[in-house]
Amino acid sequence: MHYRIFSTADTYINSGSNLITGETFKDQNFGRDEILELKKVYVNNDFGYQTRVLINFQGPDFSEISQSIVNKTITSPKFKLRLFEANGTTDVSTNYSLGAYPISSSWDEGIGRTSDSPKTTTGCSWENRSFYAGASPVTWSHDDGLARHGVYFYTGSGYEASQSFTYASPDIDMDVTDIVNRWLEGSNNN
């Protein structure tokens, strides 16, 4: 039997800046974008900046499956993260790896889009996990996680998943069973 659980919130955060104007993306929110941009940008063969994708799976679908596991209605579940490439991949390297980690803090999806002018800063960004006009920003804090630029997330046994690509489709089909099991056991408080 297969269940599909869709995210309740998703966004990406960007550590770079506009290559033409120099305006930073570090405080910009992309919470309402339809596309999650996961990339590393190189300028003249030098690393320029990267993005990270944030996905939240809280909600009734996940709670229902969680309860079914506790009640032993579902035994030995497997969890997969599936994301699909939306644009062409002509600039993608032939060999690369992606990692998935649970983050140590909650975050706010926000209301921004890439095309917003002026840019929207309401919600999470590379610099902040939450920000609203007229309020103090809530920065990414270290809650027993390790610093990984832009967010703090857990690492180590059971807290990471990865997928490698070698001349392969960029679609993500990653086994995240260990990460989800840690969350279900209460090891990850977020």
What are these model-predicted stretches?
Residues M1-N190:
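Secreted, disulfide-rich extracellular signaling modules
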